[in-house]
Amino acid sequence: GAILMLQPALNYGCVHPAEVDRVIEVIAALGLRGHAMPGENRTAIGITGNKGAVDPAHFENLPGVADAIRVTKPYKLISKELRPEKSVVKVGNAFIGGTELAIIAGPCAVENSDQVFRVAEQVSKSGAKFFRGGAFKPRTSPYAFQGMGEDGLKILADVRDQFGLNIVTEAMDERGIDLVEKYGDCIQIGARNMQNFSLLKYAGQTRKPILLKRGMSATLEEFMLAAEYIMAEGNYDVILCERGIRTFATHARNTMDLSIVPAVQRLTHLPIIVDPSHGTGHNYMVNPLARAGVAVGADGLIIEVHPCPEKALCDGAQALTLTQYAELVDQVRKIYELVAMSEMAFT
């Protein structure tokens, strides 16, 4: 692969869209695909679709091209080589990866309207802008509650209409992606589907942002390449999520790998959030690991909340009560402010 750096046009202040289009046409004529990534001071175009090495010399003399660089990493579009500044992903009417801590909260599974609306009221009151809830549930047992399907998505759409919250919910197959695209604001690809490559390609063809969860035994490079699959299809609005990995430890459902947060941020411009609910599996661990995730630099949290966790049809052991959730939000926001202040002090 290769990256082309375009210089701002004189008297225009930034790269002229017509120049970007011209360069992409030349790339397409060579049987390749160009991916434009506008930045603050420049526009980069990533080139994919090549079977072998791309010779940057092909593009160096094109109008507007300031530099052409060969990319050596197996992933191109997610790389900081392509976009040094951080990407901010718009989800509905709010943002993930910007200056505000993103909090995505709600029940593991949509069970009924009353349950969902009770949680949504608290989530809205807390100032969070995103609501999670599963309408399609991948369960280890075929006899466990599998979710309400499209009826559940309709309830989530009602939550958006009433509370103004942006809906994040999982799709397990192509039909699910079509339905979530219709009713939701962000499509979640779960840990078990992180390497379902046909599903990743299909997700890359949608117009909705994708929340990609790390597989339970995925390496950093496998995680990065899964995101690359989505972006290579043209969907550049990808949010990464650490949700715990499988280890020998038995004291928690999974092991939260918080070291992945700075590792990801060193390599990619994509935002990354953490899921301390699935990452621990225990109610009493969620708040400490949420605080730690924010302290280590995560862009947001995804938290499971239920009005009566002991009656939950799915993952009740890791759900917070409404009161516990309110306490968590207050604490993590203070930590986020401290982290932001300390980063400013050291730069």
Locate each region found by the language model.
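Active-site mouth loops of central-metabolism enzymes
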Residues: 100-118, 141-147, 166-170, 190-191, ...
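Non-catalytic terminal accessory/regulatory regions of metabolic enzymes
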Residues: 18-103
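Alpha-helix-loop-beta-strand connector modules within alpha/beta enzyme cores
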Residues: 145-169, 202-209, 258-273, 318-341
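Catalytic alpha/beta core domains of metabolic enzymes, predominantly
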Residues: 91, 206-305
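Active-site segments that bind and position negatively charged phosphate/pyrophosphate groups
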Residues: 1-17
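Glycine-rich, proline-tolerant flexible connector loops at the mouths of alpha/beta enzymes
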Residues: 132-150, 307-317
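Hydrophobic faces of well-ordered beta-strands that scaffold small-molecule active sites
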Residues: 101-107, 129-133, 167-170, 185-189, ...
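Catalytic beta/alpha-barrel core
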Residues: 148, 163-175, 185-198, 209-220, ...
